[in-house]
Amino acid sequence: MRKIGKFIWAFLAVLAVFLCTGLATLGSVQSTGDSMTYVSGKTVMYKFSGGKKQLGSVYVNVGTIYEKIGDRVSIEIEYSSQSSPSTSGGTDLVPAYYMSNVYSSAGKNGLNYNWQEVTSGKSVSTEYLYFKASANLQLCEIVALDKDGEVIPMTPYTGSKDFTQEERAKTLDAQAAFNVEQVKAANTYFTFTQEEGLSMTAIHTLSAKSYQGCVYNLDGNFGVLSTLFMAGSVAIFGQSVFALRLAPFIASAIALVFLFLLCKDLFKSEKYAFFTALLFALGGVGLTVGRVGAPYAMVAAAILGSAYFTHRFFSKGISSKTPLKSGANLLFSGAFAAVAIAMETLSIVPVAAILVLFGFGVARIYKAEKLALEKLGVGKEEEGQELDETQKKAIAGVKAEYGYKKRVAFSFGGLAFVALTLFTFLAVGAICYKPLVLVYDNVGTHSMSFLSLIFTNALDSAKTSGLTAYTVENTASVFSWLLPLKTTYVYTAHTGTQYLAFGLSMNMGLAFLSLVALLFTTIRVAYGFVKKTADKAELRLRRIYFILLSAMAATMIAAGVKGMPTLLSATVFSAAFAAFVPLAAMSQESCACEKCKKIADVILYASAAVAAVFFALSLPVYYGFAVSHGYESVFIWTTFLRS
């Protein structure tokens, strides 16, 4: 059994820290429980337990709103003190409260699935409470507080004919979990961001019932498969912040593993693979993307998985002894590629770059066949040399062997990258047929075919359509990804004493080092071409250089084509960009002298130290925790130009 090297143990330690700190700070598992479907024009009525109470404020938690993203909805809270109250309404407690579906041009923070104080500043003595809204929506929870801020126990009013007793009880099943201090504090631990409000809305659409006059929404930035993946953990843990962020976070850890394995294969070194994974973990982008309840990290993990298995095929080829087993690399690669494209259609751009690597792998098989035949004398008969029977049999055997290898490569490649992609789209379309009809067609009169629904959803994810208030503000040229010129914020909040800015930015120190390493290796590779150096180390350096450069270019093109690119789409880019630092270090080992090896180690360890320092300085942004006013200067470490 092969001994596990120290750098593999070091990577496992980094992965363990990544998982433990991430899971511990991911978010609360508190859920608002079940929800009821509120129909516009009706009234939800409650009665305070124990008679009249001095009502101080009312908080509501509204989930999915069946209107277009960005539309405004009014919420009215009324009260009554009569012994025989009207079941259709009472006296307005305060003027109507307005909230927008997912986002508002007036505010950046998400409202859906978060607690909102809809009345305050007016204390009345009352016994009955009414809820009304101007749109159909999911009412998750409603809480009434007395003038001292204590929860007032209440029950559904039995005299009301609107909605059943069981339906109204669902809006009171998490009263004990309400904490007004948590609601008012600036935090991401208990709060859904706008991106996450959109994700929760899409998840709810998967199981939504059809109601007249409702508008149903999916996350327009991604295919419905990504919503299915996140729906699993929400089904297990409930409508909580932790549940929504769990799938993307696990995906970010998987991406870290695939990056390590890919670089171990690329560099032929556990040391360089470890430092690449470490720099990616400290880089900021991969960490934060995995902590946002949106599919970005899942797409990145699928692309890295596809790249890893394709490179295994490229480097190892098809084995003569176990051709089907080695060909399975292509099946795994195609499966991950299919998942990536089904989650985000423009993943087809990086997948196309991966297919180029597949083409080079096939070319290697042809080249190996040619060399094997030349060794047996093929071509010499043209010089007047006859081949004996033994040579002819050997040649026939080589042709049969490599013919089988080529058939395995092409059949597995075609099955993986074409058939699996088509199957994935069709399977997801069949599973999610009803929600696709709700979003894109008319339930009563079907006008779109099954394939049209799938195609429309795929086109949706190829453009920026699921906008939030942060989308435009976070937009920057893909070339700005080379340096942290602009921090991408997904949630900001401030109270009288605290300020919070949760976002992602390429680690400033690492970004500068990566850019220098990119320029250095570019000059180094160009110098090798000029000098016509062609030794084994030089060829490996060039191969790694062009693979990393292709990964960066492919993700930049995909984001640019989609429009409004942000760092949320730069996970694969940041991994490839950070890998140039180990590549620059490896280039110093080409002469194989002890001094050069020491220089390479200095580059690696010094770069890791610099990245760790800037990572520590940027913790409030990466992990999304608040700092006291007066300490906002910590955010200057996240960007060169502005924060």
Where do the model's predicted regions map?
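Transmembrane helical bundles and short interhelical boundary loops of multi-pass, membrane-embedded
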Residues: 2-45, 184-187, 356, 362-366, ...
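Membrane-proximal lumenal/periplasmic loop motifs of glycosylation machinery
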Residues: 184-195, 207-227, 466-472
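Loop-to-helix entry region of an early transmembrane alpha helix in multi-pass inner-membrane enzymes
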Residues: 220-228, 237-254, 500-511
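Transmembrane-helix motifs of polytopic, lipid-linked glycan transferases
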Residues: 242, 246-267, 305, 517-524
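Short acidic/glycine- and proline-prone juxtamembrane loop motifs at membrane-interface regions
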Residues: 248, 285-298, 345-346
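Specific aromatic-rich, kink-prone transmembrane helix
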Residues: 258, 298-321, 336-337, 573-577
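Short helix- or helix-capping micro-motifs
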Residues: 276-281, 337, 341
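Membrane-interface transmembrane helices that cradle and orient dolichyl/undecaprenyl
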Residues: 306-331, 340, 362-369
